[in-house]
Amino acid sequence: GQEIPQTERVQSNIPAAEVTKATQSPLFLTMLFCMGLTATLELAPGRWIESLMGPAFVEAGFKNNAALLVLVYGMALMAVLRYSAGSFVKKFSPTGLLMGSAILGGVGLFAMTYASSMQSIFLTATIFYVGVCFFWPTMIGFVAERIPNSGALGLCLMGGIGMLVVGYVTVPGVGMIQDYYKE
């Protein structure tokens, strides 16, 4: 049979107890909490795009659901920027990139609430999506670099908590808010 290669943790002689201890550190627990916020900030506004920006699109002569173009544009922009994220991390450091992302994401989200023309919608969406696009991968990288003993378990927990918060808290929560304000 084929021999399965050793994991990086085993090759580095890091005991499993050390991995568990690293995932219980205050910095790691703070990053888990922040990952929940990150996932919410990145994915929740997409649920509101149609209701917030739909009227401006209809006024500009587009059919219903055309506001979803903003969502498609944002996802495409994030894919392109995430592909080149390494150069941004080298230029600004992970902590600097997270801070810049938080500022741009917050400013963009706030500005989107005031956007009323096609130009302002896409400008504010660009600011927002440039801000949030680096959050998820940079947080995973931050844990890998700053809490290396957390290993694969730490990376798995970071991604997992993000998806759990989105699936079990954000989507139902945003849905309840939307249902409340529709009536």
What are these regions (language model features)?
Residues 150-182:
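A late C-terminal transmembrane helix in Major Facilitator Superfamily
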Residues 1-9:
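C-terminal membrane-cytosol helix-exit motif in multi-pass small-molecule transporters
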